[in-house]
């Protein structure tokens, strides 16, 4: 299965609590931190919820 790299590019400070919890659930802490996750519908849904805070790129 494909993998994706998710990078936190904007701060979740001042966002609604559900968005802050989604950022933590993705494994992102500080700005510019990155994680590599499997590309599946659950992760894609989380990315959609915080798409204004993260950048996503495909890992080969």
UniProtKB/Swiss-Prot annotation:
Q: Which GO terms describe its molecular function?
A: structural constituent of ribosome
Q: Which GO terms describe its cellular component?
A: cytosolic large ribosomal subunit
By its UniProt entry, which CDD domains does this protein fall under? Ribosomal_L30
Q: Which PANTHER family match?
A: LARGE RIBOSOMAL SUBUNIT PROTEIN UL30M (PTHR15892:SF2), MITOCHONDRIAL RIBOSOMAL PROTEIN L30 (PTHR15892)
Q: What are the UniProt keywords, alphabetically?
A: Ribonucleoprotein, Ribosomal protein
This protein's encoding gene: rpmD
User: Which BP terms from GO are recorded?
Assistant: translation
What family does the Swiss-Prot or TrEMBL record give for this protein?
Belongs to the universal ribosomal protein uL30 family.
Q: What is this protein called?
A: Large ribosomal subunit protein uL30
Per the UniProt entry, what species is this protein from, by scientific name? Answer: Streptococcus sanguinis (strain SK36)
PROSITE patterns linked to this entry: RIBOSOMAL_L30
